[in-house]
From Swiss-Prot:
It comes from the Archaea. GO terms for molecular function: ATP binding; ATP hydrolysis activity; ATP-dependent DNA damage sensor activity; damaged DNA binding. Keywords: ATP-binding, DNA damage, DNA recombination, DNA-binding, Nucleotide-binding. This is DNA repair and recombination protein RadA. SUPFAM superfamilies: P-loop containing nucleoside triphosphate hydrolases, Rad51 N-terminal domain-like. It comes from Methanosphaera stadtmanae (strain ATCC 43021 / DSM 3091 / JCM 11832 / MCB-3). Disulfide bonds: none annotated. The keyword rRNA processing does not apply. GO terms for biological process: DNA recombination; DNA repair. Belongs to the eukaryotic RecA-like protein family.
Amino acid sequence: MTELEDLPSVGEKTAQKLRDAGFADMMRLATATPKELSVKVEIGEGVAAKVIEAARKAEKIDFETAFEVMERREDVGRITTGSKGLDELIGGGIETQSITEVYGEFGSGKSQISHELSVTTQLPVEEGGLDGEVVFIDTENTFRPERIEQIAEGFGLNIEEVLKKIHVARAFNSSHQILMADKINELIQSGVNIKLIIIDSLMAHFRAEYVGRESLATRQQKLNQHLHTLQTIANTYNVAVLITNQVQSKPDSFFGTPTKAVGGHVLGHASTYRILLKKGLSGKRIARLVDSPHLPEGESVFKVTTEGLVD
């Protein structure tokens, strides 16, 4: 295994700065951009580019065959949602190395799914979990440990142990939200077995802070960088990312869904899976798979009970 000190242009001092900035992992370093590394490690962009290039050579980042990609995808894990129908709709559960976006109107079940997955991630692999811990970035004050207790009881789990494995950050603005996402690298590198990152909700602060067309470009640029960070973490550490999102009305829509997810094309391209949630009759929820690289569109119906999601 190549150490940071083995890379050209990296001495002991630079290696320590890299570790302090969250770049202890060689793959994390190899997938960084020169500008990102320059800012976070406080080195020149020229030096940063050389360090990244050396890390890429050490990790042998190059073209690979489709067969090799298929073999690598065998490492992808999936986390059960608690609903068999919803799991089947999305190919077996929430996928690692991917960003899954769940969007819908208020009360459609977005935060319920977030709380459910905070528990199911901790289940053994044979029971649909990944035997891992969770990061929950809460932007709208929706996280409730009492709800976690109810779901954990439903699975017969030790409530205290479940709560201890959920790392909650209350983000008060978009800059704080971005900072907490950046700090996930440090948490993982410290030895915490993070297997799911939840942001509930992704766009709340961005929408509130960047108002008007004149600020749209800045908002989308920051959002793009934020999503890039999340995808890099997902790829580097084989972690699943779940983001919940708000909707806005489509006044020109005469057919189909009268609402659309906020975040524009930047978010649309970044999300590997997009799931629309709608309220149904008798307390039921309807999940529609809107976008996926390999799965067809479809729908699933589930209910939210005291003990979690059920078919």
